[in-house]
């Protein structure tokens, strides 16, 4: 497959069952997904950086629609990445950003919305402490 999202969801599933180290060992290499910022998201899960994803979101001076799409996918996958890494506060922050404009992003927008609601419930139940 040449779809970064397939590789990322595989990573997320493996990390939930067998841990992050196992997910890293089994991470699927993708070389030709050209969607912004998916290349950088793939790199993030393969030991890249948050900054690479954030920079890619704005690279090339995208128009408003492209910027909104880039921000949505960047924030969604940054949130899921940080959740897998055990950083619940950063995860919740990025997922909340992705969920804000969920209506414009179809199925994946609904994923962001539902995940945000789930994380809010965890905060309410004091399973995750909100950022101060």
Regions found by a protein language model. Give the residues of each.
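Alpha-helical tetratricopeptide repeat
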Residues: 69-80
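Alpha-helical junction/boundary sensor with strong preference for TPR arrays
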Residues: 1, 31-34, 45, 60, ...
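Residues that mark the junctions of alpha-helical repeat units in TPR/alpha-solenoid scaffolds
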Residues: 3-5, 64, 71, 109
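TPR repeat positional signature
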Residues: 7-9, 14, 37, 75, ...
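Alpha-helical repeat scaffolds
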Residues: 20-34, 52-64, 92-96, 126-132
């Amino acid at each position: 497959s040449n779809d970064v999202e397939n590789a990322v969801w595989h990573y997320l599933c493996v990390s939930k069952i067998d841990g992050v180290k196992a997910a890293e060992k089994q991470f699927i290499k993708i070389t030709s997904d050209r969607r912004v910022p998916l290349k950088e998201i793939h790199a993030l899960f393969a030991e890249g950086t948050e900054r690479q994803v954030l920079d890619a979101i704005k690279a090339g001076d995208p128009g408003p629609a492209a910027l909104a799409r880039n921000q949505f996918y960047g924030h969604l996958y940054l949130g899921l990445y940080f959740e897998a890494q055990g950083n619940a506060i950063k995860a919740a922050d990025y997922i909340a950003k992705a969920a804000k404009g969920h209506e414009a992003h179809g199925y994946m927008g609904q994923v962001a919305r539902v995940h945000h609601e789930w994380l809010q419930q965890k905060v309410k139940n004091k399973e995750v402490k909100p950022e101060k």
